């Protein structure tokens, strides 16, 4: 195919999936990785599954334990806190956007170990200091605070971590 044909070619129209096709696709997806009920609903909307049938498909997935928001939230909290170094606020916000209920989010966030949270943040801030350009200690403190807060940590924890990381760097 030449370049002009690729440019003028219209995107393929996707045929809407039936409820049965969506169920099979979601079962395959959920068998490979955890999905939330919100993820499943978004995918069904993208696949143009009829509105009336979406809830039935979701109920079947939940009944057969392909989708469990509690299990999903626990895995998400574990992954984002340990691997990505996120704080509780950012994790909770992301879970809310994925359609997980507040009660499940609160329960999943209960597994966070607050004793490990501060040392991890201090280590991330130490690495950040090495790559940050600054002209004064005041400017560096501001940049580190913004960084810690953007990771989703509470203000008190962020402030302690910034102070600890600056003391260790002799700044």
Q: What is each stretch, according to the model?
A:
Residues 1-171:
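An alpha-helical, amphipathic repeat domain used for nucleic-acid recognition
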């Amino acid at each position: 195919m030449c370049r002009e044909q690729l440019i003028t070619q219209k995107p393929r129209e996707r045929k809407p999936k039936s409820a049965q096709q969506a169920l099979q696709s979601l079962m395959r997806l959920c068998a490979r990785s955890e999905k939330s009920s919100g993820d499943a609903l978004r995918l069904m909307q993208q696949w143009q599954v009829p509105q009336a049938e979406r809830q039935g498909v979701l109920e079947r997935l939940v009944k057969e334990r392909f989708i469990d928001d509690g299990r999903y939230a626990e895995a998400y909290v574990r992954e984002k806190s340990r691997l990505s170094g996120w704080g509780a606020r950012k994790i909770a916000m992301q879970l809310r956007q994925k359609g997980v209920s507040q009660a499940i989010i609160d329960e999943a966030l209960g597994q966070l170990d607050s004793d490990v949270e501060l040392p991890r943040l201090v280590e991330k801030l130490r690495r950040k200091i090495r790559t940050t350009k600054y002209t004064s200690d005041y400017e560096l403190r501001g940049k580190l605070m913004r960084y810690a807060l953007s990771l989703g940590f509470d203000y008190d924890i962020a402030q302690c971590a910034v102070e600890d990381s600056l003391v260790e760097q002799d700044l």
